[in-house]
Every structure is written in structure tokens, then in C-alpha cells.
């Protein structure tokens, strides 16, 4: 059966700007839930705790939180976590896992998941830290990204920390970019991905075919590509300082060709 057909075969210019509103259904979410190992998540959470100097009971905003793997792991370490995401499937999954695990009860942490847009954070100075993991920073165009960064800045208290995880900086994807098809398999889910770079709009267009038995999904994702310097300027304009760049949770410095950018910053 076909679960959902998105904009996989329409011209690049016709891909809706709000592609992310319909993209994150069961097959994409389940694929990434399986692909992200416990070791990967633990390394990310170690990085967040150590680089931001978090103490037990810290109030953390995870936005967008996806299926909640970082939120759940942080809560299990004794933090008070709020996860926000626009995908109803991902939020439902995260809530179910939290309930099944009775997560964080022994450690004294808490976690709650809210359905909502990453730009609509009606909180002011209540979080000790915010995290934006897994490439979602590039989902929005420049105006939307500014709105998101401003919303996070309002939500984090003065002196609070921020971690942004982004694998689609210009320094990461453009050196050696070929656009060749890539096939990924996890369990009984297969994904074929084709990528093209829209130089006029500085966007990476990713067209996916997900397959799980008779279930198939074709969908297109857009990542707006920013330079490392541009990201730093966006954060500084919103009120963040002490911006530092890493290529890996072990603290490796970010350089040209690094496949991943982990930015840490402080709310001025």
C-alpha cells in the first residue's frame, strides 16, 4: 500500500516551503528511530551536559524533539525536560515510550511532550538550556530560522545554554558534493535518497523513497544551507554569545569538510 505521497516528483521550485508539516509520518520517523543508536544518543547527551555545565534538575527545552530520544535520555539523567515537535506521530511515540519506561522517576527527572511549531514557544526565560538536534535547524527559510532563534532566545534564561546540531552547513555538504543516489537499510525499512543542490536558493533538495514490505512512501525534504559564520551571526543577533563550534561530541574542532556542526552558545 502507499501510505502517503508527497512532493517527490514535482519540480524543485514547486516543493512547498512547509514540507516538514507532512513529511514526518510513520515511515520516516521509524527509520530514524531505528538508525539512531543508544550509543549515539548517549554521546550527544554527554556533550550537552558537559559543554553546558548542566546540574541535576536543569530545565531543558528540546525543540524540535522528534520522537524524543534526547528528551528521554536527559530526563533519565535527572533533568526536567520539555520536548516540542510538529509531528503528531513523533509526539505520540515519545509519550508512549515515556509512559512505558516510567522514564526519569528514579532519577528525579521529568519529561513532557507538546505538539507545536518550533517558532511558537510561549515561554520567557524559564529554561536553563535549549537543544536543537538532528539537522532540523535548516528546515525553515531565513525568516523562519530567525523567528525560531528569537523564540529560543526568549525561552532561555540569561546565562542559559544552547546546543545546535546541524549537518547541512555549506562547509559540510558542498566540498565533494555529487548528488549520487544513496541507499540505506535498517531492519525491514529501505530508503533510497537522491539529492540535488539548488544553488539559486542555497537549498539541499532530498527526495526519498521509503519501503517497508508493501508500505511505501515518496517524500521530499528541503534543508536551507547556511555557512558556519552565518549561523554564528544569527545566534549573536538573537542575543547569544560565546559561540563555539565542534565537529563531534568528543570536542573535535569544526573545519571545512566536517560532516557535522555542533554549536554551543550562551544567552547574553
Regions found by a protein language model. Give the residues of each.
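Class I SAM-dependent methyltransferase SAM/SAH-binding core
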Residues: 69-120
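A short acidic, Gly/Pro-enriched loop at the edge of an enzyme's catalytic core
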Residues: 120-129
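SAM-dependent methyltransferase
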Residues: 143, 163-234
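A short glycine-rich, Lys/Arg-flanked "PGG" loop and its adjoining helix->strand segment in the class I
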Residues: 146-158
Amino acid at each position: 500500500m502507499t501510505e502517503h505521497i508527497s512532493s517527490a516528483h514535482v519540480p524543485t521550485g514547486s516543493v512547498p516551503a512547509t514540507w516538514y508539516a507532512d513529511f514526518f509520518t510513520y515511515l520516516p520517523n521509524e527509520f530514524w528511530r531505528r538508525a539512531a543508536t543508544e550509543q549515539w544518543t548517549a554521546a550527544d547527551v554527554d556533550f550537552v551536559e558537559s559543554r553546558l555545565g548542566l546540574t541535576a534538575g536543569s530545565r531543558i527545552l528540546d525543540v524540535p524533539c522528534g520522537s524524543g530520544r534526547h528528551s528521554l535520555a536527559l530526563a533519565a539523567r535527572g533533568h526536567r525536560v520539555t520536548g516540542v515537535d510538529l509531528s503528531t506521530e513523533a509526539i505520540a511515540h515519545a509519550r508512549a515510550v515515556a509512559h512505558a519506561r516510567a522514564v526519569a522517576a528514579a532519577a528525579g527527572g521529568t519529561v513532557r511532550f507538546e505538539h507545536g511549531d518550533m517558532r511558537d514557544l510561549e515561554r520567557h526565560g524559564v529554561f536553563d538550556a535549549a537543544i536543537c538536534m538532528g539537522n532540523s535547524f535548516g528546515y525553515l527559510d531565513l525568516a523562519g530560522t530567525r523567528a525560531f532563534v528569537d523564540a529560543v532566545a526568549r525561552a532561555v534564561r540569561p546565562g542559559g545554554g544552547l546546543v545546535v546540531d546541524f549537518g547541512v552547513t555549506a562547509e559540510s555538504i558542498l566540498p565533494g558534493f555529487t548528488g549520487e543516489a544513496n541507499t540505506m537499510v535498517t531492519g525491514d525499512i529501505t530508503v533510497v535518497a537522491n539529492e540535488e543542490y539548488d544553488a539559486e536558493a542555497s537549498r539541499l533538495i532530498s527526495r526519498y523513497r521509503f519501503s517497508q514490505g508493501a508500505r511505501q512512501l515518496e517524500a521530499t525534504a528541503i534543508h536551507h544551507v547556511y555557512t558556519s559564520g552565518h549561523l554564528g551571526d544569527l545566534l549573536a543577533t538573537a542575543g547569544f554569545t560565546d559561540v563555539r563550534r565542534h565537529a563531534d561530541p568528543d570536542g573535535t574542532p569544526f573545519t571545512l569538510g566536517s560532516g557535522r556542526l555542533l554549536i554551543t552558545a550562551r544567552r547574553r
